[in-house]
Amino acid sequence: MLNRELVKGSTVILVLTLLNERPMYGYELVKEMGSRSGNELQMKEGTLYPSLHKLERQGYISSYWEKQEKGPDRKYYRITDEGKEVLAERTKEWSVFSAMMDRILKWSGQNG
């Protein structure tokens, strides 16, 4: 299980990355993150939904309701143009940060 603070700090880029592919509802986002991470990333809905609401307030995502043939309506989220710009910036930042961490950890003998 990953450190909770690492997951929390990565939520924005994870959500925007997935929503850049297609609109998804909250539970679908949780499942997709788990699936793609080999179930290493077990994001709790209590972490995800406040992040979704914040991203929506910031204008990075928008939401809409969709009727279901069976079961209750689902609230889907989609990335906005502003969200795509933020995703591009955060992806560059992540790449720089990740490379820096790898260099530091390798230099100190902590990363293989």
From Swiss-Prot:
Key words, A-Z: DNA-binding
Claim: Acetylation is one of the keywords in the record: no
Name of the featured protein: Putative DNA-binding protein YwzG
GO molecular function: DNA binding
Pfam families: PadR
High-level lineage: Bacteria, Bacillati, Bacillota, Bacilli, Bacillales
InterPro entries referenced in this protein's UniProt entry, alphabetically: ArsR-like_HTH, Tscrpt_reg_PadR_N, WH-like_DNA-bd_sf, WH_DNA-bd_sf
